[in-house]
Regions:
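Terminal, non-globular segments
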Residues: 1-162
Length: 162
């Protein structure tokens, strides 16, 4: 139960993030909705890189594609690329001050958002609106909250049921 219990927490947090991603929001708030799934995947890939990798990013990316009704593989490609970069730099990133980590998160979210835009632009002509950047900024601002909550989840001791 020891190894699977920790992975269960990881999957649960990612599934919760998927719920936040597809939660119905009014048009006003929908443009501010950051990519919760990517934020959670980034956290877990930095915190426990031996448990969360490119395969998990690809898998949850495909699930996100299905849940959002986007072209199959869009999120899978974006998440895999970002998590690959995180895994390559995770030892350095863990040593950085929080502000610099947030700057890295900004660039990860920006890379994902741009990749999704370019894929959408190949599929159909897409217009780059100013609201396109809002989820990147909101996600960067939400990073301290995501980090704190997921760190608490990771370090919480399991409840014994005897």
């Amino acid at each position: 139960m020891g190894n699977n219990y920790g992975f269960g927490r990881i999957v649960l947090t990612i599934v919760f993030a998927m719920g936040l991603k597809i939660a119905p929001l009014s048009a006003i708030f929908a443009v501010y909705n950051p990519d919760w799934v990517l934020l959670v995947l980034i956290y877990w890939s930095l915190a426990v890189p031996e448990r969360v990798g490119i395969f998990h990013a690809w898998t949850f990316g495909l699930l996100t594609d299905v849940l959002t009704g986007r072209l199959l593989g869009q999120y899978a490609l974006a998440y895999s690329l970002v998590i690959y970069i995180c895994l390559m730099l995770h030892k350095r990133l863990r040593q950085l001050p929080f502000i610099q980590q947030a700057l890295f998160i900004f660039f990860c979210l920006l890379l994902s958002q741009l990749l999704l835009f370019f894929i959408k632009n190949i599929q159909q002509t897409a217009e780059l609106k100013p609201t396109f950047w809002l989820p990147v900024f909101v996600g960067t601002v939400c990073w301290p909250l995501v980090y704190t909550v997921l760190r608490f989840v990771r370090l919480a001791k399991p409840i014994k049921t005897d």
